[in-house]
Amino acid sequence: MTKANAGHPPSRLLMLGALGVVYGDLGTSPLYAFEETFNPLHVLAVTPANIYGILSLILWGLVLIPTLKYATFALRADNDGEGGIFPLMALVLSRIRLSSHWRRRVIIFGLVGAAMFYGDSTITPAISVLSAIEGLEVLSPQLGSWTVPLTVVILVGLFWFQHRGTTQVGQVFGPIMFLWFMTLGLLGTIHIFEQPTILNALNPWWGVQLFYSQPAQVFFLLGVVILALTGAEAMYADMGHFGIQPIRLAWYRLVFPALALNYLGQGAFILKHPTATHHLFFQLAPEWSVLPLVILSTLATVIASQAVISGAFSMTAAAIKLGYLPRLRIDVTDDYHRGQIYIPVINWLLLVTVLLLVMTFRKSSELAGAYGLAVNLTMVVTTLCLILVARHLWRWSIVQISLVWVSILVIEIAFLIGNALKIPYGGWYPLAFGGVVYMLLGTWRQGQVLLRQQLLQANARFSLKELLSQGVARVPGIAVFFSPLPDMIPLSFIQNLQHNHVLHQQTIFIHLATANLPHVPLSEQLTYRVTDVGIYEIILTSGFRDRPDLRLALETCQQALNLPLNGQPMSFFLGRRTIIPTHARGMTYWQKVVFAWLYRNAEDATSYFRLPSEQVVELGIQVEI
């Protein structure tokens, strides 16, 4: 592990950038979180004791989860400066000696967390933009009929412009979110001064007392309180973009105070106006400022949605490199910032799903039942992995782990029980969506293992010396063959010898490997050797955030091995495999069918690795699994 940004004072620009990317989701929670606790579904009376109790739970939830868990401890668990569920899983698998049983568990944890993140990626844009546009109803109830159409237009526009990248637009995200958080704090402060008794909610006893007074509603209420904590995972996931200190300082200096003040202000307002629970956030503002506030909140929710969409792109790219998803087309939208990527198929799948959610649920209050469960599951998975990190890498004692991590885990499981009670009211959606994603991730991973076993069995029948002793003609030029495993003869090479009976003067086997690190230095990416039959074997190892540069690898090997590459024709031989599902053991038949479909629809290697198509030769190979 490395200490990101250690020894360097955090840049104000990085702190501003963190506001626009890291805290968009957390920052827009005041639009719906506190109001949702007094939804008639929960049968919670608007009394001072209940208001203090709910506020106490929200405020102390912000202290325990974003502040203690993420800002204080989780940010220490960086994988070469990167955070998030896949980097954390890779960190545990690479740095901690675990039995095969526990390694499988960690992989399952990681896949569940990733699957739930995708579920969250569809709900966040829908509920955020809906809740912002609903503010128009404060101006006039008749405007309520425009909520869904306007939301659809905004979301379509947001996803439509993804292919252009977010670099230029992203430069204004930070200042807009700075204005948003200042507005949150100001609106809350005004009403706190009008009703200072609301500060009683700072006492955690009110939260405890709520449990005693509302035992039948406790877990339902916890399932709603979690709405105020959604987005906390981004503090850890976006660590690689901004560093530890900018994220921490933005939280302590602006985000946490602004959120606390706004929630207290909402409590003060409802304490004074017990019947004003509808569109509570917008009622904090004077009537003349409601429209500007709707516009500002819409911008804030679009920014929050953008952060989640970008996160889905990054998650997908990492999943592809780590072998949990098939190759997909990935466009780099900024040559100077390689992390700025666009994945068309993910973008349009997200858009279709988000629009279906908006048109099905139609109100943010209806979507609130679906929200929270996906985020909560990701939080629990992160905590379980962090317990392993604390025990094995930080060398914490059992007592320390019990006091900190087990306590946090118990709280998150209590939230999880509360969210589980919302399954009939929309909570089924993230479970269903996440279940499908988990099935795809697991099926692809398991299918790849099965495919490699079949390839190894087929490969065991051949040896290079025997293949080359069968009257092979040498032809000028360079041939590059891709090997799925080190020390394995590429099947495309075997096919070429068997059908064409030729061997190029310079023949190269190249294997692309992915390390459990986000980035691998260029000096450590290449290993190479010359076999005793004169064939060059190259292993190119890149990080799961890196894009392998084949041209640079070949140029480096040319210098190191004195390969005469210049001026000679080069051909890339690719094996186009057709997967034939069978009823043999290893995986259920329906999973094999799904795997074959995924394999068939993966982006071809020519496009993915940006190979010149006129230099590519494809050889068809059928593989039964």
Curated annotation (Swiss-Prot):
Entry's transmembrane regions: 14-34, 45-65, 107-127, 141-161, 173-193, 216-236, 251-271, 293-313, 341-361, 370-390, 398-418, 423-443
Intracellular or extracellular location(s): Cell inner membrane
Main location (coarse class): membrane
One Pfam family of this chain: K_trans_C
Membrane topology reported for the UniProt record: Multi-pass membrane protein
Keywords noted in UniProt: Cell inner membrane, Cell membrane, Ion transport, Membrane, Potassium, Potassium transport, Symport, Transmembrane, Transmembrane helix, Transport
GO CC annotations, alphabetized: plasma membrane
GO molecular-function terms, A-Z: potassium ion transmembrane transporter activity; symporter activity
Catalytic activity: K(+)(in) + H(+)(in) = K(+)(out) + H(+)(out)
InterPro entries to which the protein is assigned, alphabetical: K+_transporter, K_trans_C, K_trans_N, Kup
Entry function: Transport of potassium into the cell. Likely operates as a K(+):H(+) symporter.
Family per record: Belongs to the HAK/KUP transporter (TC 2.A.72) family.
PANTHER family: LOW AFFINITY POTASSIUM TRANSPORT SYSTEM PROTEIN KUP, OSMOTIC STRESS POTASSIUM TRANSPORTER
Name of the protein in its database record: Probable potassium transport system protein Kup
